[in-house]
Amino acid sequence: MITVCALIAAFNEERYVGQVVRGTAAHVSRTVVIDDGSTDSTAARAREAGATVLTHERNLGKGSAVRTGLTYVLAQPCSHVLFLDADLQHDPGEIPKLLDRAEHGVGDFVLGEREFARDAMPAARFHSNVIGSRILSRFIGAEVADSQSGFRLIRSALLRKVSLTGRGYEIETEMLIKLVRAGAALERVTVRRLQYEGARSKIRPFRDTFRTCMLALAYRYFPGES
């Protein structure tokens, strides 16, 4: 039986964070929200829903929020850490798919890959994800179809072996690279991507794809320094 702490980085997500926390809490031992300098009621909504809330006084970026959260959750008695977004792009109802794969598969690193219809998202975002995922797959030697997905379940002991430095969304790629290099057996499950009113990704497709490519190249040609 695995025990799970959920880590949710949030920036100005008062509209959906409570719903995400409540949906997540049904499947995990503890839910931790990192309020990354929000100027709205994100922290209050998360607390009302039952989450432990850690707060940045100003916006430092998703990577910084994830690293703050990891410092906290890796000190808790949890065998795995679940990562998901606060904006409802990741359906908490899909969490059991990741848990089941962790319990009955290898269980090191389970990546929730979203179902994408080409016409269901902006072209720039779609193509940036495809290109970034193909490049990353080639350089790490493991097939990845959705490298930008932050929906993932990872063994705590493995996370303690790596040092993450990313401040922005590139931390998703950095995590994949460093954990695979540390020996993680990567497993993938297909998860439903929610469509909701007012959906707007904070990812900048061209900038973040460039960073993905640079990280992959650094891993390939300078493995001791990346």
Language model segments and positions:
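Short hydrophobic beta-strand elements that form part
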Residues: C5-A9, V32, T55
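Cell-envelope/extracellular polymer assembly enzymes that use nucleotide-activated donors
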Residues: T3-C5, E174
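Acceptor/aglycone-binding surface of glycosyltransferases and processive sugar-polymer synthases
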Residues: E57-A75, P92-Y169, L194-L217, Y221, ...
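Short beta-strand-to-loop acidic/aromatic patch adjacent to the donor-nucleotide binding site
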Residues: C78-Q89
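A short, conserved alpha-helix in the catalytic core of glycosyltransferases
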Residues: L158-V162, G168-A185
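Acidic helix N-cap motif at the loop->helix transition within catalytic regions
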Residues: R15-Q19, D40-A49
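A conserved acidic beta->alpha catalytic loop
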Residues: D35-A44, L88
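Short, well-formed alpha-helical segments that are part of the catalytic scaffolds
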Residues: I8-A26
